[in-house]
Amino acid sequence: YEVMPSLVGSEMCIRDRIVPGNHEYYNYSDVMERGMQWKWMFRENVGFYQNQVIRIDDTDFVLSTLWSRINPNDEYFVWKGMNDFRQIKFDGKLLQVEEFNRMHETCIDFIRKSVEESTAGHIVVVTHHLPTLEVIDPQHKNSVLNSAFASEYGDWIANSRIDIWIYGHSHTNIDTEIGSTKVICNQMGYIFA
């Protein structure tokens, strides 16, 4: 990844909206400290948004982490293989698969409701996790860890009013189209302080 942290909040970026990903909660941050719907402005023009809709002109931006749904058959492998379960807290305890899946349900319910209720001419959904397995890197297509990265909503997206779905988290930039929705990868990468 090429990371240019000096751009975030600079004069080159008028307004930055950041969707928190799993790494924003590492080092034992508690996911529930802020709840499942919040915004946090850490500069006048830069902020994190979780399960929020922002209207700009005639476009609704639906912003959500969209935690993925862990496949029951892969729970053990995901729990053992992903640092999230050793680095993130949920209500004071280390995150477990059950809470991960509960957060997923909260996020997808928010996204679906926001898209359904939108009166904007255009809808852009921005998530951290992937909305479809179609954008998993081909070299990882059969990985037991895929459900920690993506949930399958291709059929719903194809029949939705969503114009663009922007995602990150995949470690590989893959763009595609599902129905009339452009699915675009825009991940920032890691910032090491």
What are these regions, as identified by a protein language model?
Residues 10, 22-24, 52-53, 65-67, ...:
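Active-site metal-binding loops of divalent metal-dependent hydrolases
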Residues 62-124, 129-140:
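Active-site-proximal loop/helix segment associated with metal-binding centers of metalloenzymes
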Residues 53-63, 122, 177-182:
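Beta-strand-turn-beta hairpins that frame and shape the catalytic cleft
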Residues 1-9, 14:
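Single conserved hydrophobic/aromatic residue that forms the stacking wall/gate
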Residues 46-49:
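A conserved beta-strand/loop element that lines the FAD pocket in flavoprotein oxidoreductases
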Residues 10-11, 20-43, 136-138, 174-179:
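Metal-dependent catalytic neighborhoods of phosphoester/phosphodiester hydrolases
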Residues 26-28, 56-61, 69-72, 132-135, ...:
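Short catalytic/ligand-binding loop motif for oxyanion handling, primarily in non-cytosolic enzymes
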Residues 17-19, 132-193:
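Conserved beta-sheet core of the metallophosphoesterase superfamily
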